[in-house]
């Protein structure tokens, strides 16, 4: 799955690009092929499914479970990677994350909106507190998911209609 790249040989700046192709199968299951396009090439195969609420079979985690897992895993990865680069020894790391969304019923559908994102960090380290705090601050800035969630984003949707793509 992963190829070996020396971070010291990467350019000072780069675009990190991913793409994902999803195929609906079964009742509510989605099979996903995720490609890291640059600066390196990697491919991952994932799936999502829903439980009975949406009429699925719960054969894979629902998208929201993967969402919070991705956020938690991203900050944990950055803390561990940056601790090595910043020469900060950590003996143990645990993260407890919570996300709350608001859900509002509209006839037979619903709308959602994020309410809160909370990440509690437990680090065992003999390093001074200020160095551990600096590590967490650096990891926050290096976590692609946290940086994405921390700003307003525009998500463009297009629908294929015949030979054309229509903005939705």
Regions found by a protein language model. Give the residues of each.
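Extended beta-strand/beta-hairpin segments
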Residues: 1-69, 81-168
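Short, well-ordered amphipathic alpha-helical segments that serve as non-catalytic structural scaffolds
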Residues: 77-78
């Amino acid at each position: 799955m992963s190829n070996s790249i020396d971070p010291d040989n990467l350019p000072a700046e780069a675009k990190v690009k991913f793409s994902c192709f999803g195929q609906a199968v079964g009742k509510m299951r989605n099979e996903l092929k995720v490609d890291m396009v640059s600066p390196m090439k990697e491919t991952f195969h994932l799936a999502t499914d829903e439980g009975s609420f949406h009429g699925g079979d719960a054969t894979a985690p629902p998208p929201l479970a993967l969402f919070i897992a991705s956020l938690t895993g991203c900050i944990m990865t950055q803390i561990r990677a940056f601790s090595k680069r910043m020469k900060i020894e950590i003996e143990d790391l645990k993260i407890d994350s919570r996300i709350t969304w608001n859900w509002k019923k509209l006839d037979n559908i619903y709308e959602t909106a994020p309410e809160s994102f909370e990440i509690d960090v437990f680090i065992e380290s003999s390093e001074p507190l200020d160095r551990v705090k600096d590590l967490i601050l650096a990891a926050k800035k290096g976590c692609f998911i946290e940086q994405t969630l921390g700003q307003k984003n525009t998500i463009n949707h297009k629908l294929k209609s015949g030979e054309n793509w229509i903005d939705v």
